Amino acid sequence: MAYSKGVSGTLSDYTHLRTLPALLSVVFVIAGLYQFGGISDVTITWLSNYTLTSTHAMGASIGAYALAFASSETKQFDNYQDFEKVLIAAGPAVILGYEYIQPVTDLINTTSNAGPIAAFVVTVVAWGVAVR
């Protein structure tokens, strides 16, 4: 993207940024880190020290994923190759499976951090493919 000179040109350049997908990306990554254990504890002190749960993180992740995919320029599955379709489906499957299906949770929660890190990477890659 070529950058314009001057204040009005710079302002125009910033209006072309896709701020909603960028904001959703931040929400998605932070929620994923929290859900898979990369962030240990989130407490909102303004709400009488209310602590967020992994269910909140799952809801934020799925909500951000759905909004971003719906606003994507290539949201029709015909626009994706087969391996991309698998990745797009794998993201929400891992997020929801980790929360609601005990065998998936057990598979991801290994004795090391490898399982949660791999699950997080799968969801972020799925995000990248879905919102391209």
UniProtKB/Swiss-Prot annotation:
GO CC aspect terms: membrane; virion membrane
Membrane topology annotation: Peripheral membrane protein
Membrane as UniProt keyword: yes
Alphabetically ordered keywords of this record: Membrane, Virion
Localization per record: Virion membrane
Endoplasmic reticulum keyword on record: no
Role: Envelope protein that may play a role in host-cell attachment and viral genome entry.
The protein's name: Matrix protein
Organism, as annotated: Halorubrum pleomorphic virus 1 (HRPV-1)
